[in-house]
């Protein structure tokens, strides 16, 4: 009987063993400080496997930090590990995600070390055959891709980074465009700006292109004054502003091509659901010309984080376009003297070969290559940069290897309003909308809407080589951009000018005198101190706000030499067949200094031309 009981008990245990144990699921949440505020990660683990990860950070930069939140979460699930690679383009957000993920596992009662195995990517070599290959998925690259695809061409875009956008996604202002319907919604009040530009022409009496443009604009201005209908601007005035801003060394033909095609570019962008309808003032522009996006409340938003996700969506929804991310181009393939493809390296170290009938370089400049910057312009050694990590000048180097010529390589722009602690770009649009700059003594020191090189030089000459950008509540109420700066912790505030001075360590009495004087200048529409002609509204609505800014490397005006068809030229001035370039990888357009708003104009106009020309060549 005892033996039988034991046998039955054994059978029962065996039967119970056949029933799987209930899966154990635990969830934990952790938080860490990101770029714009708290980043929160929630991780769910079932039977020792990461089954769900959500990463949230409402104030992380759209198109940069927001992509890191998505990509790193997916990588953790795929690899069952929190030891995933940080995104070089979003290091602060990435590090916050990794720190918060570790805290989430601890909160779930788990050991983070058990989920920290490094997963090595494995991939085979790959070969593709397409009509057009584009290197770089920034604004120029995606514009070119969409344009070539419109012509029915198959396109591959190679992007070295894990996110699209390059420097374009970091653009904060808008797009300059001349003689547009959006401009005509404004009442013209920029007489002083136009006349100031015309009065400056004597400085450029030896520059034939500027002299001719000046004569044309003077005739246009006289005609407008005789019959002031609509808003005054013209292609030629945009050209003139661009040439003067570039100190007259610009390629006049390329400047004309850009300016003449901006209005059409604004219209074309609507096909990708991009609408730039708010028109404002920017440094170096005689009139209101910069076209900006607005949110659902009508408040201005940063142009890059608005445009680039829409461009990316348009590319991904186009059956003719393939995006290969984290794929770094190394070599331009040549056959019988013509470009015919790209050899690249994938994330896993595998070789990716793209055979194509035409090649477009849209890799951006080299503003993140601080060694290269210092070599070309030693006085910029030690400066911070606003540039995306991938802006290393690799496209220029690849093209030079096949005989391409470069131009203006030592023309490197610094931007005067870079947030002093993070190198985040503070939009020039705030100065165009009425903001002022004061130094450590609480005093203005320059026409704030002058060209970037002039404002930067004046700022560097101040105590500590920094300044404070001052705005008021009325400006904040109209701008989601300023609201974003507040959320990121960039902003100091005070209910009075005196209180703001105390908050930023500036003499309150001096700041109060400066602001009251400025508000009087705005009312009179006259700045006898520095000759500013763009005033907007007085800064007299409390509370008042200040952002500490300094100069940082922002744009490289030099690059590959191209013609009006975006064909890359060799060192003898001849076309390299099949090779095109657009965007910051090129040189000659902006001369010695780029005007704010012209980078987007550049990549839209020349991206479209490159896409159309490459598509035609591929026929």
Q: Predicted segment positions?
A:
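Active-site- and interface-proximal helix/loop "cap" or "latch" segments in soluble metabolic
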Residues: 24-119
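Helix-rich C-terminal "cap"/substrate-channel and partner-interaction subdomain
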Residues: 83, 88, 463-547, 613, ...
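Beta1/beta-strand and adjacent pyrophosphate-binding region of the FAD-binding site
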Residues: 122-140, 156
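Glycine-rich FAD pyrophosphate-binding loop
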Residues: 150-171
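An anion/pyrophosphate-binding glycine-rich loop and adjacent beta-alpha core
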Residues: 201-213, 392, 396-400, 404-508
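Conserved redox-cofactor binding core of oxidoreductases
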Residues: 233-350, 370-371, 522-541
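A glycine-rich dinucleotide-binding beta-alpha-beta segment and adjacent secondary-structure elements
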Residues: 331, 510-593
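Glycine-rich loop(s) and the adjacent beta-strand/alpha-helix scaffold that form part
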Residues: 347-350, 354-419, 606-609
């Amino acid at each position: 009987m005892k033996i039988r009981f034991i046998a039955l008990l054994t059978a029962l245990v065996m039967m119970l063993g056949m029933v799987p144990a209930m899966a154990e699921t635990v969830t934990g949440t952790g938080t860490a400080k990101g770029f714009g505020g708290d980043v929160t990660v929630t991780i769910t683990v079932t039977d020792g496997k990461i089954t769900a990860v959500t990463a949230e950070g409402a104030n992380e930069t759209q198109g940069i930090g927001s992509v890191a939140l998505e990509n790193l979460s997916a990588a953790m699930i795929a690899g069952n590990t929190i030891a995933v690679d940080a995104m070089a383009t979003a290091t602060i957000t990435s590090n916050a995600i990794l720190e918060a993920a570790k805290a989430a596992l601890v909160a779930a009662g788990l050991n983070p070390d058990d989920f920290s195995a490094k997963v090595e990517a494995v991939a085979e070599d790959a070969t593709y055959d397409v009509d057009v290959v584009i290197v770089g998925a920034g604004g120029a690259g995606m514009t070119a891709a969409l344009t070539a695809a419109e012509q029915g061409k198959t396109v591959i875009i190679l992007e070295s980074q894990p996110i699209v956008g390059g420097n374009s996604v970091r653009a904060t202002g808008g797009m300059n465009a001349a003689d547009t319907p959006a401009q005509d919604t404004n009442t013209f009040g920029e007489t002083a700006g136009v006349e100031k530009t015309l009065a400056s022409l004597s400085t450029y009496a030896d520059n034939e292109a500027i002299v001719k443009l000046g004569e044309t604009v003077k005739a246009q201005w006289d005609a407008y004054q005789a019959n002031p209908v609509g808003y005054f601007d013209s292609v030629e005035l945009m050209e003139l502003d661009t040439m003067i801003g570039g100190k007259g060394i610009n390629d006049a033909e390329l400047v004309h091509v850009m300016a003449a095609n901006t209005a059409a570019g604004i219209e074309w962008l609507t096909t990708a659901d991009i609408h730039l309808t708010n028109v404002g003032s920017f440094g170096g522009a005689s009139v209101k010309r910069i076209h900006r996006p607005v949110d659902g409340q009508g408040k201005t938003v940063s142009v890059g984080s608005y445009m680039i996700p829409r461009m990316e969506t348009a590319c991904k929804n186009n059956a003719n376009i393939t995006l290969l991310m984290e794929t770094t181009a190394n070599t331009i393939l040549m056959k019988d003297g013509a470009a015919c493809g790209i050899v690249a390296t994938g994330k896993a170290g595998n070789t990716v070969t793209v055979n194509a009938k035409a090649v477009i370089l849209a890799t951006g400049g080299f503003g993140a290559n601080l060694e290269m910057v210092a070599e070309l312009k030693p006085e910029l050694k030690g400066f911070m940069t606003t540039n995306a990590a991938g802006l290393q000048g690799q496209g220029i180097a690849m093209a030079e290897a096949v005989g391409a010529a470069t131009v203006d390589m030592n023309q490197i722009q610094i931007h005067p309003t870079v947030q002093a602690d993070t190198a985040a770009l503070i939009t020039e649009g705030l100065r165009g909308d009425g903001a002022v700059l004061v130094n450590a003594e609480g005093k203005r020191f320059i026409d704030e809407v002058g060209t970037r090189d002039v404002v930067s030089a004046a700022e560097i000459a101040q105590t500590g080589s920094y300044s404070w950008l001052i705005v008021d509540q009325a400006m904040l109420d109209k701008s989601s951009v300023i609201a974003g700066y507040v959320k990121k912790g960039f902003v100091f505030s005070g209910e009075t000018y005196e209180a703001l001075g105390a908050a930023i360590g500036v003499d309150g009495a001096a700041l109060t005198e400066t602001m009251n004087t400025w508000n009087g200048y705005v009312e009179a529409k006259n700045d006898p101190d520095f000759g500013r002609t763009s005033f907007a509204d007085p800064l007299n609505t409390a509370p008042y706000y200040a952002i500490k800014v300094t100069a940082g490397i922002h744009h490289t005006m030099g690059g590959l030499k191209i013609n009006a068809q975006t064909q890359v030229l060799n060192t003898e001035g001849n076309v390299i067949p099949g090779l095109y370039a657009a965007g910051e990888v090129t040189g000659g357009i902006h001369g010695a200094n780029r005007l704010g708003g012209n980078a987007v104009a550049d990549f839209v106009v020349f991206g479209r031309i490159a896409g159309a020309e490459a598509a035609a060549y591929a026929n």
